[in-house]
Amino acid sequence: MFRNNQPDQNNNEDENNTNLNSNNNNRTTTTTTTTSSNINSNNNNNNNNNINNNNNNNNNNNNNNNNNNNNNNNNNNNNNNNNNNNNNNNNNNNNNNNNNNNNNRDFIIRTIMQDLRLGIRDIIHPSTLTGLLGGYINALANLDQNQSSSSSSGASGSRSGSSALNSINNNNYSPTTSSLNRVRNQYNQVVRDEEDDDYDNGAEDGFDYDGDDNEDGSDSACESKKKRGRPRKPTPERCSNCKITHSSYWRRITVNGQKLDFCNACGLHQMKRNNRIKESKQRHSIQNIMNQNQEEEEEEREEEEEEEEEEDEEFETLEEEEEDDE
């Protein structure tokens, strides 16, 4: 009995072993499946997190770019507005300066004409003012100003169409007209004499034109002796600088190789400017610089000679002192 049962026990043990192996296999398969699923889920989560992070970074970059663009646009707009405001302010300042200059020029012209009206009373003897009462003395101020508006038409073709003279002639005041002509001729004589002095003292080809020529030829009789030999030149249309169309005295001055016509004030200013340019060119010329260099070299030589003489004198004094000591 005992021997017959031994093989059965062995069989049972084999079965148990097989069952254990199968259980172990099942456990390993379950563990491998669970670990693989966990790894896959972790990978998916990591991928999702990376995608979300990338999206967030892209959104942040887009927002930053938009903010930078907006800031740049705002800065550009502010700069443009500031530039426009500055330009407007500069234009306003220029306009104000031009208005001030025009006002100053008008004031100077009014002052000059007032001085002329007052000066006529001092230059001319009171007896020649007979018939000029009634406001006609003020017509003298308009003679030169209305030359440009004088008409060139007429039977005689002369330039005696000044509105101031026409207003007097139309009233048929012959004493007033003759007195006015005498006053104007005497005044022109004084002006010519003064301007002749300016011409002889360095005016560069200036010439005068006093307006209308009288029919009786009184203007030619009043010409100064210095100008009788010179032919009368035509009146310029306008000043090359201030564009004024009337002046009692015109100056023709060379500027940059061209001869230009200037009124009296602009001509004097241009002459001074030409003189300054000429002096500057002479001062900075090569010959002047060479002369200055020669003078500096001579001064240096004189200083060196003086130093050598002083050294010789000191040496001689030292020798004399040594001889005395011996």
Curated annotation (Swiss-Prot):
Compositional bias ranges of the Polar residues kind: 165-189
Biased composition (Acidic residues): 193-218, 294-326
Zinc finger (GATA-type): 239-266
GO terms for MF: sequence-specific DNA binding; zinc ion binding
Source organism superkingdom: Eukaryota
Record field: compositional bias (Low complexity): 17-102, 148-164
This protein's UniProt keywords: Metal-binding, Zinc, Zinc-finger
SUPFAM superfamilies referenced in this protein's UniProt entry, alphabetically: Glucocorticoid receptor-like (DNA-binding domain)
GO biological process, one term: regulation of DNA-templated transcription
Keyword Nucleus: no
Stretches for region Disordered: 1-102, 145-238, 277-326
InterPro entries: Znf_GATA (IPR000679), Znf_NHR/GATA (IPR013088)
Name this polypeptide is given: GATA zinc finger domain-containing protein 21
Classification lineage: Eukaryota, Amoebozoa, Evosea, Eumycetozoa, Dictyostelia
Gene that this sequence comes from: gtaU
